[in-house]
């Protein structure tokens, strides 16, 4: 994957009044004491992923950012100033007024989106003026996700609702996943018709089918993040861990 982020500037977002990150590398890890703003940096960058909420359930901003109302997005509640995240790939800005509510623009190198978010924090309007997807993708592991079929070759942010399709579409990924279960004398079964994943366990002459969501969270988490990495190229991937 080519490095496509070198410098990021964040302003007026949650606890961040103004912050510049420079000389970013291919892999960047934010480490620090609790409540110093590490997650807010990830959340600010995740605003680039708003267009992917169209393919997600629910289509709410809370899938990317922790908040209960619009004003929590703005530094010290100051909605007179716009939230702005600028980087090598473009600018994302969010604004608020009583008439329009929360709205914004995502101005990328080859794409432009107009964003409208209602008072329930649901993405209501998303106008794409070109035909490319954003290069920044936030992935947030959740259990009990209902999988669905998708033509997307990449894992759909933020929850990976097309996990089954992605594993099937990438032979090396599928091989890795099957090996993970083989180590525990288990087999993975893909039901394409119902878009479900089952785990097959053999005990003597008996066969048991175990729901995917019943296996250990650690194993589900590993498969989720492997799928995100295998299915993306030329993208910036954001992980909570």
Predicted segments with their positions:
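Pre-Walker A-like glycine/lysine-rich segment at the N-terminus of P-loop NTPase domains
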Residues: 1-48
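Phosphate-coordinating catalytic segments in nucleotide- and nucleic-acid-processing enzymes
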Residues: 2, 51-240
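Walker B catalytic carboxylates
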Residues: 11, 240-241
């Amino acid at each position: 994957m080519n490095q496509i982020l070198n410098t990021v500037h964040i302003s007026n977002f949650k606890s961040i009044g103004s912050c510049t990150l420079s000389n970013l590398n291919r892999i960047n890890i934010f480490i620090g004491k609790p409540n110093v703003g590490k997650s807010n940096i990830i959340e600010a960058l995740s605003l680039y992923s708003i267009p992917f909420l169209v393919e997600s359930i629910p289509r709410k901003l809370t899938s990317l950012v922790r908040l209960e109302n619009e004003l929590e997005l703005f530094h010290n509640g100051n909605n007179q100033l716009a939230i702005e995240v600028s980087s090598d790939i473009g600018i994302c800005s969010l604004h608020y007024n009583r008439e329009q509510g929360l709205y914004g623009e995502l101005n990328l190198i080859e794409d432009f989106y107009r964003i409208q978010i209602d008072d329930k924090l649901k993405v209501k309007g998303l106008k794409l003026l070109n035909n490319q997807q954003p290069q920044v993708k936030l992935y947030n592991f959740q259990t009990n996700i209902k999988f669905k079929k998708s033509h997307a070759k990449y894992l759909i942010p933020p929850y990976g609702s097309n996990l089954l399709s992605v594993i099937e579409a990438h032979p090396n990924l599928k091989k890795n996943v099957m090996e993970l279960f083989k180590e525990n004398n288990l087999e993975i079964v893909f039901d394409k018709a119902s878009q479900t994943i089952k785990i097959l366990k053999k005990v003597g002459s008996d066969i048991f089918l175990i729901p995917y969501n019943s296996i250990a969270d650690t194993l589900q988490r590993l498969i989720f993040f492997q799928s995100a990495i295998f299915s993306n190229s030329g993208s910036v991937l954001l992980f909570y861990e």
